Amino acid sequence: SLDGSNRLKLVMLDEYDRIRIYEPTLKRFIDLDILGGSEELLWKSDDHYGGSNNAFLRITYAGQPMSDWAIDDNPDKVSYVKLRVLTYDMNKNGKNDVIIVKNLSAVGRIMRNLTLYTSSEIYDFEWDGIGLSENWKTKKIQGYVADYQIKDIDNDGEDEVVLSLVVSFSGSLRKKSILAAYDLTVPERVQ
């Protein structure tokens, strides 16, 4: 629960990588994205988060044997896999914070199907009843976060955020994948 009650909220990234928060519903997602918004939509971010290089091409199947299936390379037929959105009770107050990655692109988000993520940031947000408020964010991390999870990877009884990073070397097409872990400690608030 984002607010400490037992009322659940649906937190997701939309097709433009904006965070959306909904009241639980049995409606299909396509029915929630209507002109003017739906009554279930509680909040939508102005900024983009997530960002993924993980994609698949849709395959055309017209009742043909598998050997005759065609890969449709039309850019509109590319589906990007959204990064997960994690919730975690950072300060043990019974309220889950939203922890999300923002992959930063060297070319911005001008072209929808052109992604060149070179760095990233991790954000921690808290639900204040009307929207998400930023608690903290990391400094810029060199590399693209392909996935992330919260786990106690060093068995010290404290959870860490574990990143699967893809790091590019400048002036080269070579890439290296690494796992990085950050302690999840609540920063002291400056008064």
What do these predicted ranges mean?
Residues 1-191:
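Beta-propeller-forming repeat regions
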